[in-house]
UniProtKB/Swiss-Prot annotation:
Main subcellular location: cytoplasm
Subunit structure as annotated in this protein's UniProt entry: Monomer.
Name listed for the protein in its UniProt record: Ribosomal RNA small subunit methyltransferase C
Keywords: Cytoplasm, Methyltransferase, rRNA processing, S-adenosyl-L-methionine, Transferase
Compartment(s) where it occurs, according to its Swiss-Prot or TrEMBL record: Cytoplasm
InterPro entries linked to this entry: DNA_methylase_N6_adenine_CS, Mtase_sm_N, rRNA_ssu_MeTfrase_C, RsmC/RlmG, SAM-dependent_MTases_sf, Small_mtfrase_dom
UniProt superkingdom: Bacteria
Family: Belongs to the methyltransferase superfamily. RsmC family.
UniProt EC number: 2.1.1.172
Catalytic activity: guanosine(1207) in 16S rRNA + S-adenosyl-L-methionine = N(2)-methylguanosine(1207) in 16S rRNA + S-adenosyl-L-homocysteine + H(+)
Gene for this chain: rsmC
Annotated function: Specifically methylates the guanine in position 1207 of 16S rRNA in the 30S particle.
Length: 328
């Protein structure tokens, strides 16, 4: 099964023949293995995709060169711009690129984004997607330092949060995390796992308040991991930061697993990651250990929590969010 975007690309296989090809962006299927190219590589920011594929580079930056670059558009325009500018800044004049994306994700805006850097034209429209061909004429400037954002918040004391584009809670402390942090009114001890750490807000806050904890922070997103690492470093805090698809790369058991888990996948609502978190958490908790999560009040997590833990407590709630606690 391949994505709608890949189904559109499948109509244009002649572009790939006898070329070295680099796939990037939001690709999430097996299409790269099907193209009639001389060589194929993939650059992905998503560990859940990269961990199960060969020839996939999971990293913040990419230095690969290719005759043809193929970019899968995602909903987050800032993340798209970050990755496109990085790719084109190191490419030679005349670099060929295909950009494909769903119309509902805003792929049309690629024309305005890339117009100043070369020739771009729409060459196909199908499966509610657009496919664009681009040829580089003017090399864009790219500096990683230009993309960092930082903020502080009264809830966080003197912590300063650092984040890159596309990372959750990148520009300000979100309401759900604020509510979750408000429930940390009792000392935190032992081993702590911040799952889906984003820019590192939750883990850094706990480590600042309770320096003795042994902290692990995990996320699937390369930009989130880089953001958490910088948030820790800039605040002189230490923790282990790992790439993991929920618990796929997590070892050991914890006294506290804490999370503001994602419930959006692109522009769709997805429960896979949260369902896995709840279903598998008991195997990663010490006896009596706690799982504490914040979630939109309308999401059906109480039933999942009760199914796997027997019961749950609501530690705090607003009209939009609830903080749930269960113990192993």
């Amino acid at each position: 099964m391949i994505s709608l975007e890949s189904q559109v690309l499948q109509r244009h296989l002649s572009f790939f023949e006898h070329k070295s090809v680099l796939f990037a962006g939001g690709i999430n299927d097996q299409f790269p293995q099907q193209v009639p190219a001389r060589s194929v590589k993939v650059w992905s920011w998503y560990f859940d995709y990269a961990k199960s594929k060969s020839a996939v580079d999971f990293s913040l930056t990419c230095e690969e060169k290719a005759d043809l670059m193929v970019f899968y558009w995602t909903k987050n325009k800032q993340e798209v711009q970050f990755q496109l500018m990085q790719l084109l800044a190191q490419a030679p004049i005349g670099q060929e690129m295909l950009i494909v994306g769903e119309n509902r994700c805003g792929v049309r805006s690629v024309e305005k984004m890339l117009d100043a850097y070369g020739d771009i034209a729409k060459i196909d429209s199908a499966r509610r997607c657009g496919l664009y061909h681009f040829c580089l004429k003017n090399t864009p400037h790219f500096a990683l330092a230009d993309y960092w954002k930082t903020y502080q918040h009264p809830r966080l004391g003197d912590l300063r949060i650092y984040s890159l584009p596309g990372v959750f809670s990148a520009n300000e402390l979100d309401v759900g995390t604020d509510l979750l942090l408000s429930t940390l009114d009792q000392p935190v001890r032992g081993k702590v796992l911040d799952l889906g750490c984003g820019a590192g807000v939750i883990g850094a806050y706990i480590k600042q308040q309770y320096p003795q904890v042994e902290l692990t922070m995990a996320d699937i997103h390369a930009l989130a991991l880089a953001s958490s690492q910088r948030t820790l470093a800039e605040n002189q805090l230490e923790a282990e930061v790992i790439a993991s698809d929920v618990f796929s790369n997590v070892a050991g058991k914890f006294d506290l697993i804490i999370s503001n888990p994602p419930f959006h996948d692109g522009i769709d609502t997805a429960y896979r990651a949260v369902s896995e978190l709840i279903m598998q958490a008991k195997w990663h908790l010490v006896p009596g250990g706690e799982l504490r999560i914040v979630a939109n009040a309308f999401l059906p997590y109480p039933d999942l929590l009760d199914q796997h833990f027997g019961s749950h407590c609501v530690l705090a709630k607003t009209t939009k969010f609830k903080v749930y606690s269960v113990r192993g």
